[in-house]
Amino acid sequence: MLTFALVAAAPWIVIPLIALWRARGDPSLDNESPEDTNEAPKVSVVIPARNEGANIAACVQSILMSRYPALEVIVVDDHSVDDTLAIARVMAGFDDRVTALEAPPLPDGWFGKQWACARGADHASGELLCFTDADTRHGHDLMSRSVHRLRSRRLDFVSVLGCQVMLTFWERLIQPQVFAMLSMRFGGAREVNESSNVIDKLANGQYMLLTRAAYDEVGGHASVRDQVAEDLALAQRLFEHGKRTELVEGRNYLSTRMYTSFGTLVRGWMKNIYAGGVRAAPFGWIGRALLPLALLAGPVASLVPIVVLILAAFGLVTKAWLAWSIITTVATFIWWVQVYVRAPVVGPARALRFAAIYPLGSLILAYIIVRAVIRGRRVEWRGREYVAG
């Protein structure tokens, strides 16, 4: 009985261990020196912004406080209905490094973010381009360290993984589960960088730094105009064109609060998880066809042990399955403890509480995935509807 339980439970034990091993030794901006200010190339920071009135001032201010000496900030308002553009214009009036633009009408076949980024790039004068989101906050040395990494390693593209700020119950419960699912697919930054397979390339659209020459050569954002995960698509396109791309940890220098409520969190991941995941599906058309099952595998694997354990409490399964459910539930709980401890949920005690209710998070994640699969390539975001390419 115990032998059966241990053998059957092996995937719940081995797969998390493999995931932890894959995430080891990630490159970090902590190991980079700031760029020499005497040789610093100009960086044009482009911020696409739609209804970001609550964020845009703090984002721009954090960039302007950078120790990097040669930069300009271009805020491109994507037809906001709040005061985003007005705030950006006020900031431009106080600092000549800031430019506030209003994007032209959105053409057919374009996503709003890519259109705004492309228009910002048109106005950029820097040798380097940096695309960042309005909900990010930049540390004083983020620009200097990322530029130094790009130049010292002769890279064409660097994307930084920042700290994901989570303040509400739902953020702390669900966000770590999504990121754990992504780590199961991609591993850590080191593995992404070392892979020679284009579908393994990944970027974080919250901070992407690249040379102007590489951006223009691959066609800029026009080349990924209809992609949900435009960051991943751009990194893959650069790699396909022989450019050197890198993903690097920078949680001490960049922070982002992606979603602020349960509703925005569900809608945001429903937009990205399936339509964006198609580009990263391995094994060609077979992988794309099986993507819904692959996405659901994680949350289902987390839920099955606890379901069997509940059935065992009512005497509905054999002793062998009871033993299996105990082993796998404990293994799954330990996995989620380390996931939540590594996430910024404010201390080990709180991480233990969230790990204890991991089935709720897994159930919600499964719900998000099912809804995303049903919608397919149809995407709704910020009051617009798109069809992903």
Spell out what each predicted region is.
Residues 291-376:
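Membrane-embedded multi-pass helical conduit in multi-pass membrane proteins
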Residues 69, 77-87, 104-105:
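A conserved acidic beta->alpha catalytic loop
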Residues 41-44, 72, 233:
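Cell-envelope/extracellular polymer assembly enzymes that use nucleotide-activated donors
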